[in-house]
Design a protein with these regions (language model features):
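Short polybasic linear motifs
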Residues: 5-6, 10-13
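Donor-binding and catalytic core of enzymes assembling or modifying cell-surface/extracellular glycoconjugates
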Residues: 27, 190-280
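Short amphipathic alpha-helix
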Residues: 32-40
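Secretory-pathway luminal glycosyltransferase catalytic domains
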Residues: 59-195, 199-200
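Leloir-type glycosyltransferase catalytic cores
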Residues: 278-296
Length: 296
């Protein structure tokens, strides 16, 4: 089981404020937040994750980190007595109201004796010098893999495998479509598939999506396997299978991002959209080594 690194004893001699990082979102966003926690914990040993909001979070599949990666939840939970103190003195409300949008801004905004971090931190720049530790922490819990997933993984390892992930679902809702749902169009995926096919003509595409029917209708694939067996609480196994591929085509989704990032092959080719959202400001979201496919 992964253990949170023990801080240098010299770090403990300096009085530091408690740093709390709010946990929220689906699995992909939870992983970005946990990655920030691990990186910060090295320099600031009094860093904890605030899981209190996850008790009432029913979207996606709730809090999944301890189950998917067998991470030690007790090592980063806030003690119950501390939560009561925080609620009593309104620390949480005050600090969320004053939070700002970047790591630099957070470090400048000290609210003794506590600093509250609220965001998604979707960039490897937050943990660029801590990648090995992140990969170790995000080792999938093999005991929970279904027989079908195990069999498919073995089959995948016999060929030049490329994952293609298509996210639709909530992205099609009016409040999300313009900013998120209009980015990874059929044209984007077709360009990415054509690019990969030119590089790897014998490749086999493994398709993961919450709308397989749409992919079959709109994206022409030369040699495709559509993965549909991971549903509900087993959805995370799609990320595991994506990470087992040699190369990846990602959607503008944190779930998709991690599936490609956890691919351990040094020579992997990852195709990503040239923009992540229509709103912009996401230039650093994808690693520089990933191949940007133009999005109109």
């Amino acid at each position: 089981m992964f253990k949170v690194p023990t801080p240098d004893s010299r770090q403990l001699t300096t009085i530091q404020p408690m740093r709390l990082i709010k946990m929220t979102g689906g699995l992909g966003n939870q992983m970005f937040i946990y990655a920030l926690y691990l990186r910060m914990h090295r320099d600031f040993p009094h860093t904890r994750i605030d899981l209190s909001d996850m008790q009432h979070y029913h979207a996606h599949h709730g809090y999944e980190m301890h189950r998917v990666f067998a991470l030690p939840q007790t090592e980063f939970c806030i003690p119950q007595w501390m939560k009561k103190v925080m609620e009593f003195v309104f620390f949480k409300t005050i600090l969320e109201r004053h939070q700002k949008g970047s790591l630099k801004a957070y470090r400048e905004a000290h609210f003794w004796p506590l600093i509250y971090y609220k965001g998604f931190y979707q960039s490897e720049r937050y943990f660029e010098d801590f990648k090995d530790e992140i990969r170790e922490a995000f080792t999938f819990n093999a005991e929970l893999l279904s027989d079908k997933t195990r069999q498919l993984a073995q089959e995948m390892h016999q060929c030049m495998r490329i994952s293609l992930h298509v996210r639709r679902g909530a992205y099609l809702l009016p409040q999300f479509f313009q900013n998120l749902g209009s980015v990874c169009t059929a044209e984007y995926y077709q360009r990415a598939v054509n690019f990969m096919h030119e590089q790897f003509p014998d490749a086999r595409f493994f398709v993961f999506s919450d709308d397989i029917a749409w992919v079959k209708e709109h994206v022409q694939l030369p040699n495709a396997t559509y993965v549909e067996h991971n549903q509900g609480a087993d959805s995370w196994q799609d990320m595991y299978l994506m990470s087992q591929c040699r190369h990846n085509i990602v959607a503008n989704s944190s779930f998709s991002w991690w599936g490609a990032w956890l691919n351990p092959h040094a020579d992997k080719v990852v195709c990503c959209p040239s923009i992540w959202t229509r709103a912009g400001g996401d230039e650093n979201l994808c690693p520089a080594s990933w191949h940007r496919i133009a999005v109109e």
